[in-house]
């Protein structure tokens, strides 16, 4: 299950939000969740939440039923967010749900795309041999994406070596 929330925020004193607010919003969300789940969600190996700011719209992707329930219950009732003595109003919110992997795959087929584009909307780090990679290679990006997919949809594991090599060969940075 993938649930995407889009919250249109009115910044402090009506000012536009810069991307630097994204991590503070993420920290605020973790503070609203039960402590054990917040710690679980924050660990690097868990891929249950991704978020970024797109202008004044806070976009959150909740991956898996538990994240959707825990964080969704917080986001559904949020009207105001107070951060560092700054108050933000939620002007609008919407939610999209992809319940089953088949829905996700069928949506991709509907787009009739020969290419896909991946944008990193917030700082992204990759690790190799226990160290952060300054410049991630296509293999690290693909490995991260597939690990997230396999964690979310274990019934559709993507681990065929030939497929991975073909995907890696077709990725350009």
Give the residues covered by each predicted segment:
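RNA-interacting cores
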Residues: 1-173
């Amino acid at each position: 299950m993938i649930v995407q929330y889009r919250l249109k925020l009115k910044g402090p004193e009506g000012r536009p939000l810069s991307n630097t607010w994204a991590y503070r919003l993420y920290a605020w969300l973790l503070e609203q969740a039960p402590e054990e789940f917040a710690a679980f969600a924050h660990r690097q190996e868990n891929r249950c939440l991704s978020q970024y700011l797109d202008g004044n719209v806070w976009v959150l992707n909740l991956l898996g039923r538990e994240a959707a329930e825990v964080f969704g219950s917080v986001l559904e009732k949020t009207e105001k967010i107070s951060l560092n003595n700054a108050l933000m109003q939620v002007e609008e919110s919407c939610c999209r749900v992809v319940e089953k992997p088949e829905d996700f795959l069928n949506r991709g087929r509907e787009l009739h795309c020969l290419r896909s584009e991946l944008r990193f909307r917030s700082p992204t780090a990759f690790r190799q041999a226990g160290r952060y990679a300054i410049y991630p290679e296509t293999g690290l990006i693909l490995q991260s994406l597939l690990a997230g997919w396999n964690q979310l949809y274990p019934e559709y594991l993507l681990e065929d070596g030939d497929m991975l090599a073909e995907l890696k060969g077709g990725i350009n940075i």
